[in-house]
Amino acid sequence: MKSIFLDCNDQLAPVWARVIRPDDPKIDVNTEPFAREELPLLLAGYDIALDDHSYMPTELVAQCPELKHIVFLGTGAASYMNVDELKARGVTVHTIKGYGDTAVAEHTIALMIAAARDIARMDREVRAGTWTPQEGVQLLGKTLGVIGLGGIGCEVARIGKGIGMEVIGWNRTRRAGVPLADLDTLLARADVVSMNLTLNDETRGFLSTERIARMKPGAILVNTARGALVDEAALIAALQSGHIRHAGLDVFHTEPLKPDHPLAKMRNVTLTSHAAFRTLEASMMLLRRAIDIVRTIAR
């Protein structure tokens, strides 16, 4: 079976070179940018495609009759392709879980601290010649509410507890070591709310206008999961009114975020470029697992 890594970017190329082994299955690597409409030409003749967050529209994949497997480098394949439609066409989508739990959790905590102390704004102002110290929020003893206690959420809870925060969580099933609360209680009590849910039809728009209104006034929101978990218009309104003090966001409804987007212009928002999972350690584990999936398929 022929395999291709269709979008190996400049960051991943050196990592790929480190993890690939002589006895691994042959996988062609494309490092050149491509337009979406070029996808059928790029995938022509391949049975397996490794995809690092490139969009895979069903109508374009349908023009690739040999393609039977897509190995998505991460968990959120549904944000980049219609998994059910592809399955109906005989294309199986494989995802990779657990590789970046610690990386994403650490980034979540970093955004929380940056938001609490307004670090990004002070950095911008100091570089521009403005010296205006900002009064921040001390996190010791504050309540961290973790919504979604999968691998990442549990890591966020563990680190939050380690820096002296009181941690409560909301999850559909019980998780050892994290006190649970009903959602309304969590939203009302939490000084910081961390979104760590998987995006699906049930969780899309989970943090709605009504639920944002139930948040503790002046709370911080951190989202390193998926942008579509949060009602964007309601979030912007809450940031403008001050009901949400600050948001630390790594994910957005549309990526990349355009510079004229309202969130990009707000002083009380700290932004990163969907990079929470991007550490050398996580990337090495991710690529190694992807290669192992190709090996299993090709047997």
Where are these regions (language model features)?
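Phosphate/diphosphate ligand-binding glycine-rich loop within oxidoreductases
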Residues: 47-123, 137
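Hydrophobic Val/Ile/Leu positions in short beta-strands of Rossmann-like dinucleotide-binding domains
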Residues: 5-6, 72, 144-146
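Short acidic/histidine-rich motifs immediately flanking catalytic phosphotransfer sites
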Residues: 41-48, 65-67, 188-193, 216-219
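Glycine-rich NAD(P)-binding loop of Rossmann-like domains
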Residues: 121-155, 177-181
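N-terminal glycine-/charge-rich "phosphate-binding" loop or analogous flexible N-terminal tail
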Residues: 1-48
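Rossmann-like adenosine-cofactor binding region
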Residues: 55-60, 172-262
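Phosphate-coordination loops involved in phosphoryl transfer and adenosine-cofactor binding
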Residues: 67, 140-143, 209, 218
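C-terminal helix-to-coil terminal segments
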Residues: 7-8, 15-16, 87, 92-107, ...
